[in-house]
Structure formats: C-alpha cells, structure tokens
Amino acid sequence: MALETCFRAWATLHAPQPPSSGGSRDRLLLSGAGSSQSKPRLSVASPSPLRPASRFACQCSNVVDEVVVADEKNWDSMVLGSEAPVLVEFWAPWCGPCRMIAPVIDELAKEYVGKIKCCKVNTDDSPNIATNYGIRSIPTVLMFKNGEKKESVIGAVPKTTLATIIDKYVSS
C-alpha cells in the first residue's frame, strides 16, 4: 500500500516534570494500523497523575512514494516548479528497456519518499516535452533541481547509478 501521508507528532511540556522512580513517560499509541476496517487513531497515554497532559502539535503533509505521470498539462507545476529534486523517466509502452527500469524507479520513489519526486513522461503522449529536452533514446532519466536539468542518464542502468545521482542532489 502506498504511503499517502507522513505524520509527525511531538510533545511540548509546559510544566516541570517531577522525578519518577518508575521512569514513566507519555506513550504515543497508534491503534487500528493493522486493520483494514478502521482508520488509525492517535492517542496519548499519560500514566502519571502529577504530570500535566502534553500539548501535541501535528504536522501532516502529502508525500507521494510512487512514480507520478507528468505530461504537457502538469509539467511546469510538477517538475519545473517543484521545491524538491525531481527524477524524470522518459519512456514508451513499446520499449523493452523501459519496462526493465520501471521497477527500479518505483523502488527509488519509495526509498527517497519525502526527499525527491519521481515522475515519468510517456514520449508517445507528450512528444513536446521530449523534444524540448533533446530526448532521442529511451529510457532516458533526467534529474531536475530548482527547475533546471542537472543530469541525464540514457538506457536501463543499475539502481546504484541512479541512487548516486539522487544522493548528489538530495544532500546539496
């Protein structure tokens, strides 16, 4: 199942905590996570009556861990306007090597979730994008950062080759 949201929670205490011999701490409980019938719920268990309830600040953001289709309609917003680095695969349904590299791109999207975006452009459906970037062979993978093309790789390359490129732009 694709991860659709990233949830971070942290507690900010307002009162000093009395010393405790039992080492009790607030516990964050996530229930219903394994059940397909109920939505996960977040609750706080505060075992110490001397300790006031913590105030929780939550930050949720949509994070996509799968490869998203980019086309001529959404290219500017998805790739050129992205704050995160973007890995773009140019492919076609009839291309054998494209079918070989697709699972590699899927794995990278999951491994780098929240750090990069992964997109794919069908060159048959969006020939103008391919022409603008000089795509003459497929699969071709381009790396974009701040709306600029930074690197390109042609052919069905190993995962480590693409991961090395991604690491350059994620850490910079």
UniProtKB/Swiss-Prot annotation:
It is found in: Plastid, Chloroplast. Expressed in leaves and at lower levels in flowers. Keywords: Chloroplast, Disulfide bond, Electron transport, Plastid, Redox-active center, Transit peptide, Transport. Residues 1-59 form a transit peptide. GO terms for biological process: hydrogen peroxide catabolic process; plastid organization. The record marks 96-97 as: Contributes to redox potential value. One of its GO terms (cellular component) is chloroplast. PROSITE patterns: THIOREDOXIN_1, THIOREDOXIN_2. Residues 17-47 are annotated as: Disordered. Residues 60-171 form the Thioredoxin domain. Disruption phenotype: Semi-dwarf plants with pale-green leaves, abnormal chloroplasts, reduced carotenoid and chlorophyll content and increased hydrogen peroxide levels. It holds the Pfam family Thioredoxin. The active site is at 95 (nucleophile), 98 (nucleophile). One of its GO terms (molecular function) is protein-disulfide reductase activity. Its main location: plastid. The keyword Plastid applies. InterPro entries: Thioredoxin, Thioredoxin-like_sf, Thioredoxin_CS, Thioredoxin_domain. Disulfide bonds join 95-98. Induction: By de-etiolation. Belongs to the thioredoxin family. Plant M-type subfamily. NCBIfam families: thioredoxin. Thiol-disulfide oxidoreductase probably involved in the redox regulation of chloroplastic enzymes. Required for chloroplast biogenesis and differentiation. Functions as an electron donor for plastidial 2-Cys peroxiredoxins and participates in hydrogen peroxide scavenging system in chloroplasts. Possesses reducing activity towards insulin disulfide bonds. This is Thioredoxin M5, chloroplastic. It comes from Oryza sativa subsp. japonica.
